[in-house]
């Protein structure tokens, strides 16, 4: 994992709608919860995504945004989003370029580790958690990020 206090590397990846999305774009309204997960439609990843979905209102109220990254295609992400009514961006990193940049590749480069970063608008990593099999730790991490951000700057209104 990347160290807390370090700068989050800039990237651009296609989202579930095949639109290129950069880290800078994701940060335009406030801090970002960037989470990495192994695969769409697996039991653990579905549980994690749905727990984030269920926190969407609180996340947005705190001025945060969310994006998930995994090596599946935009089409897979679109189906996953639609089936589970996810309201956040899913980014496709088929070549695992960003996964490697953020140092969350699995052992010997296989797979993806379950990791979540809180990145501020200046691209500094404010906090992070790595918990491959303890999905509840990611939900607790997000709840803590929401609580910490709730008193801070609110999301800029969209037009």
Regions found by a protein language model. Give the residues of each.
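Chalcogenol-based redox active-site neighborhoods
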Residues: 1-159
């Amino acid at each position: 994992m990347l160290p807390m206090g370090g700068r989050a590397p800039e990237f651009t990846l296609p989202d579930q709608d095949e639109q290129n999305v950069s880290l800078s774009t994701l940060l335009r309204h406030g801090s970002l919860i960037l989470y990495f997960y192994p695969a769409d439609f697996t039991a653990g990843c579905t549980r994690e995504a749905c727990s984030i979905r269920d926190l969407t209102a609180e996340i947005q109220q705190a001025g945060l945004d969310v994006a998930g990254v995994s090596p599946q295609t935009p089409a897979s992400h679109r189906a996953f989003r639609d089936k589970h009514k996810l309201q956040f961006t899913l980014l496709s990193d088929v070549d695992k370029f960003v996964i490697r940049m953020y140092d969350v590749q699995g052992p010997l480069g296989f797979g993806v580790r379950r990791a979540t970063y809180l990145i501020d608008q200046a691209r500094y990593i404010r906090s992070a958690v790595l918990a491959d099999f303890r999905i509840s730790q990611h939900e607790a991490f997000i709840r803590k990020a929401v609580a910490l951000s709730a008193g801070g700057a609110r999301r800029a209104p969209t037009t």
